[in-house]
Swiss-Prot record:
This is Protocadherin alpha-5. Residues 759-793, 816-936 are annotated as: Disordered. Keywords: Calcium, Cell adhesion, Cell membrane, Glycoprotein, Membrane, Repeat, Signal, Transmembrane, Transmembrane helix. Pfam families: Cadherin, Cadherin_2, Cadherin_tail. One of its GO terms (molecular function) is calcium ion binding. It is a single-pass type I membrane protein.
Length: 936
């Protein structure tokens, strides 16, 4: 049983202790007390220790004290955590005569944020002596007054409170008067002078007394007042009031002129001694006289000034009623006016901001400001509630009575709203309710949460080649939605290699302006497309960035003159010699001039003109405008000059056009002497090379065999490669592809030349395309224009490749096999029939998108081809020039070269004779025919 009682008692004590600890933790408030008038540095309390804070945490956690009203009274030493008096504290000045006087402090520490409330009670000391309103009080007393008559006196006042304000009075010893002290309901002392002995005016007309007031403090303080008593003669009945004390309740907002009370005094005398006048006693303070007025005849007291419950909630008015006798008698009463509070004071707010500006990434519940509210009214009129304007990312949290915290309620975004103008409304509980507003400007500080953004992900720039070094080609601009250094954007190149050189050797970008400069002259023949990225990065911490792609297309200019493809044959002064039989007719192809231009478009479109020699007669030759074929204009006869010097001018279509000149020496020989003369000319011109003529047949057969094998290999490789997954375009550097197309097929060849499209970093690749020839389906196929092949894509490396068929023959690539698909190209042909074997018409939009040209046959020279024959034309992509190879019917007597240039030609073909039983002769004739075709 004993154990059970002890356990129950222990449980109750533990529960009581837990409740007490919970109450203390919930209140979070410390209480100290200090006496007023304490000196500077007076110890108040170890506030850091009492709050559970370490001394080393005070400075790092930004320990600070905020107080309402004067903030310099108390201070905290951050070294030892002691709260001490910083300046003089006068309780009477701070709290007037309120019973409780306290200084409220707010202790704030960060990391994490904590707010503690500290209340320092100011204890009263006896530092104010009792004081009378006047140094001398005058009384008029009739000599006829009976002993025990009482006369009210003005008491002293003490600004202190409690025991220090409890006053005791005494009167200096005399034989006529005593001092009586009474206490009313409000514990206020009333002094009355009591007559103990009848007065005799004839003996003494005036009495001087000294009233001494002593307070209850230690040490005691005193105050004195001099009483001057004048003894009046005979009026034995004084006016009397119904009550000695009148209590009146009055609204504090009563207007001026409002009746407070009407007093009535009576006098038992007759005549003039009965007539009474009313007036304020000399005991009434001037402040009270300014608030009220009394009618001396009627005794009505009215409001004369503005009343305020918050200043004084009650007034004591001493009224004297005196008759009009020569020796007047007076009666006395007191009117106590108690004011009733009305809701006439709006709430007041004090806002202490803590963290401004607020970072836009601040966590939720971050305390922005502390708000304290007050209302001078009392009761429900003084109960204040706060509210915040709606639709803002903040809220008010009530911490203690009349204290609120402004905290972050939702995420901030400075780019949406940079400043919040908050309106806090404080409203009291009166009826009608009064309210007040206060504005809090909350600035949102920027954090680097936005990367620079370009207007578009890719820009296309066109730059002419041969630009001056350092020229400005483009300006990139990125916008950052952040502010200040977070929006300061700098630009840089995303470095990589363009072929074998770094990107920075081609272009540079200004870090601040974003201007892109070309560091060196660009060459369209070397680089057609320069693709790179520019990075924009802000100055935030950490920095954010983004990239934009620039495609710089290098536009071609006519900076390359046509280059002649001259075979290595003998001649005088670099001229080419040709032997032509006199028996040839009109249209016989004598030779073909070939030239290439590294430019593209119109700049690479070549035309040929025959320049007449000075002083020479009209020559029987002409040159194809776009083919470069030199042919006869008429039949030659014996009257023609034996030697002709032809000047062929090769000109492109650029602005301005560039030219080159080729010289061809044409010698006319007899028909029977043409092969021999040619052999002798070759032997005399090239010397040891004449011995190779006999082996031409075997050499051509070997070349054809090897070329056929190579073509089959390339076809197989192309088929395998086309079946693979296509890859993105990269920066290529290799041999551009030349496509040669005809009715029997298309061929391709490559020539070593730098041609790059700079859009990546992959190693250079060689574009090599081969197509199998196909036979025409019918005679009408030559008259119908061919439609573009949708499967063909124009490679960038093909556009500048323009080379002669001689190189094709030397490389052994120009071959065709039967049965292949016919490669078709977009063509623009002249609608006007030409008497010449082949002409071309300029393309529509040449130099822009047209890079292929087709040869058109006139009606007089229909296109005829058979299986195994060489094509009649081929196209050089990237150039308007079409190398045309004209084929004549098999029974034609005119020897027209198909793929020969500047070579030696035989006068006529050998006629084939059919002889039965002589197979050896038939094979010999076929061998000679093959030799003729290979020479051509």
């Amino acid at each position: 049983m004993v154990y059970s009682r002890r356990g129950s008692l222990g449980s109750r004590l533990l529960l009581l202790w837990l409740l007490l600890a919970y109450w203390k933790a919930g209140s979070g408030q410390l209480h100290y007390s200090i006496p007023e008038e304490a000196k500077h540095g007076t110890f108040v309390g170890r506030i850091a220790q009492d709050l559970g804070l370490e001394l080393a945490e005070l400075v790092p956690r930004l320990f600070r004290v905020a107080s309402k009203g004067r903030g310099d009274l108390l201070e905290v030493n951050l070294q030892n955590g002691i709260l001490f008096v910083n300046s003089r504290i006068d309780r009477e000045e701070l709290c007037r005569r309120r019973a409780e006087c306290s200084i409220h402090l707010e202790v704030i520490v960060d990391r994490p944020l904590q707010v503690f409330h500290v209340e320092v009670a100011v204890k009263d000391i006896n530092d104010n002596p009792p004081r009378f309103s006047r140094q001398e009080q005058r009384l008029f007393i009739l000599e006829s007054r009976m002993p025990d008559s009482r006369f009210p006196l003005e008491g002293a006042s003490d600004l202190d409170i409690g025991a220090n304000a409890q006053l005791r009075y005494r009167l200096n010893p005399n034989e006529y008067f005593d001092l009586d002290v009474k206490t009313n309901e409000e514990e206020t002392n009333f002094l009355e002078l009591v007559l103990r002995k009848s007065l005799d005016r004839e003996e003494t007309q005036e009495h001087r007394l000294l009233v001494i007031a002593t307070d209850g403090g230690k040490p005691e303080l005193t105050g004195t007042v001099q009483l001057l008593i004048n003894v009046l003669d005979a009026n034995d009945n004084a006016p009397e009031f119904d009550k000695s004390i009148y209590n009146v309740r009055l609204l504090e907002n009563a207007p001026s002129g409002t009746l407070v009370i009407k007093l009535n005094a009576s006098d038992a005398d007759e005549g003039i001694n009965k007539e009474i006048v009313y007036f304020f006693s000399n005991l009434v303070l001037d402040d009270v006289k300014s608030k009220f007025i009394i009618n001396s005849n009627t005794g009505e007291i009215k409001v004369n000034g503005e009343l305020d419950y918050e200043d004084y909630n009650s007034y004591e008015i001493n009224i004297d009623a005196m008759d009009k006798s020569t020796f007047p008698l007076s009666g006395h009463c007191k009117v106590v006016v108690k004011l009733l509070d009305v809701n006439d004071n709006t709430p007041e707010m004090a806002i202490t901001t803590l963290f401004l500006p607020v970072k836009e990434d601040a966590p939720l519940s971050t305390v922005i400001a502390l708000i304290s509210v007050s209302d001078r009214d009392s009761g429900a009129n003084g109960q204040v509630t706060c509210s915040l304007m709606p639709h803002v990312p903040f809220k008010l949290v009530s911490t203690f009575k009349n204290y609120y915290s402004l905290v972050l309620d939702s995420a901030l975004d400075r780019e949406s709203v940079s400043v919040y103008e908050l309106v806090v409304t404080a409203r009291d509980g009166g009826s009608p309710s009064l309210w007040a507003t206060a504005s809090v400007s909350v600035e949102v500080a920027d954090v680097n949460d936005n990367a620079p953004a370009f207007a578009q992900p890719q820009y296309t720039v066109f730059v002419k080649e041969n630009n001056p070094p350092g020229c400005h080609i483009f300006t990139v601009s990125a916008r950052d939605a952040d502010a200040q250094e977070n929006a300061l954007v700098s630009y840089s190149l995303v470095e990589r290699r363009v072929g074998e050189r770094p990107l920075s050797s081609y272009v540079s970008v200004h870090a601040e302006s974003g201007k892109v400069y070309a560091l060196q002259p660009l060459d369209h023949e070397e680089v057609e497309l320069l693709q790179f990225q520019v990075s924009a990065r802000d100055a935030g911490v950490p920095p954010l960035g983004s990239n934009v792609t620039l495609q710089v297309f290098v536009l071609d200019e006519n900076d390359n003159a046509p280059a002649l493809l001259v075979p290595r044959v003998g001649g005088t002064g670099g001229a080419v010699s040709e032997l032509v039989p006199r028996s040839v007719g009109a249209g016989h192809v004598v030779a073909k001039v070939r030239a290439v231009d590294p430019d593209s478009g119109y700049n690479a479109w070549l035309s040929y003109e025959l320049q007449p020699a000075p002083g020479s007669a009209r020559i029987p030759f002409r040159v194809g405008l776009y083919t470069g074929e030199i042919s006869t204009t008429r039949s030659l006869d014996e009257t023609e000059a034996p030697r002709h010097r032809l000047l062929v001018l090769v000109k492109d279509h650029g602005e301005p056009p560039l030219t080159a000149t080729a010289t061809v020496l044409v010698s006319l020989v007899e028909s029977g002497q043409a092969p021999k003369a040619s052999s002798r000319a070759s032997a005399g011109a090239v010397g040891p090379e004449a011995a190779l003529v006999d082996v031409n047949v075997y050499l051509i057969i070997a070349i054809c065999a090897v070329s056929s094998l190579l073509v089959l290999t390339l076809l197989l490789y192309t088929a395998l490669r086309c079946s693979a997954q296509p890859t993105e375009a990269v920066c290529t550097r290799g041999k551009p592809t030349l496509l040669c197309s005809s009715a029997v097929g298309s061929w391709s060849y490559s020539q070593q030349r730098r041609q790059r499209v700079c859009s990546g970093e992959a190693p250079p690749k060689t574009d090599l395309m081969a197509f199998s020839p196909s036979l025409p389906q019918g005679p009408t196929s030559t008259d119908n224009p061919r439609q573009p092949n949708p499967d063909w894509r124009y490679s960038a490396s093909l556009r500048a490749g323009m080379h002669s068929s001689v190189h094709l023959e030397e490389a052994g690539i120009l071959r065709a096999g039967p049965g292949g698909p016919d490669q078709q190209w977009p063509t623009v042909s002249s609608a006007t029939p030409e008497p010449e074997a082949g002409e071309v018409s300029p393309p529509v939009g040449a130099g822009v998108n047209s890079n292929s040209w087709t040869f058109k046959y006139g009606p007089g020279n229909p296109k005829q081809s058979g299986p195994g024959e060489l094509p009649d034309k081929f196209i050089i992509p990237g150039s308007p020039a079409i190398i045309s190879i004209r084929q004549e019917p098999t029974n034609s007597q005119i020897d027209k070269s198909d793929f020969i240039t500047f070579g030696k030609k035989e006068e006529t073909k050998k006629k084939k004779k059919k002889k039965k039983g002589n197979k050896t002769q038939e094979k010999k004739e076929k061998g000679n025919s093959t030799t003729d075709n290979s020479d051509q």
